[in-house]
A protein has these predicted regions:
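Charge-dense, helix-prone N-terminal extensions
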Residues: 1-130
């Protein structure tokens, strides 16, 4: 897999790999691949039935965790907004300047809540578009 990992420090690699592991353990419906997310190249992309669900990317200025669950479910979005202090929250992604800013326990809880959300309307929407 040719990903952004090669650009990271040892600590950053360990944390990103821990996040990757949690994503596939907590949400067993997703499959990981390397791809592009918007203008970011060589990202980790997680799809559910061929539909983008999550992504991990690195830009020049920050890391991002992208989430279609967060985008489509107000309660999931509300959870991360209310429980984050060092994260920059957007509609469908969480930006963090370094890996210490997104505590792994918060990430795990966020994924656990996300996995329980009904993603089928999003899957059905994108399958109809194909």
């Amino acid at each position: 897999m040719n990903s952004f990992l090669s650009e990271l420090s040892k600590k950053e690699k360990e944390t990103i790999n821990q996040m990757r592991k949690l994503i596939v353990e907590i949400d067993s419906n997703v499959k990981e691949k390397v791809g592009n997310i918007m203008s970011s190249k060589n990202c980790f992309v997680y799809e559910d039935e061929g539909v983008f669900k999550y992504g991990l990317s690195k830009t020049k200025n920050h890391f991002s965790f992208h989430s279609m669950i967060m985008y489509s479910d107000q309660e999931v979005h509300k959870f991360i907004v209310e429980n984050s202090k060092d994260l920059r929250i957007q509609k469908g992604c969480v930006n963090f300047s370094n890996v210490d800013k997104f505590p792994i326990d918060l990430f795990k809880e966020f994924l656990t809540i996300s996995e329980k959300a009904d993603f089928s309307p999003v899957i059905n929407h994108y399958k109809r578009k194909k």
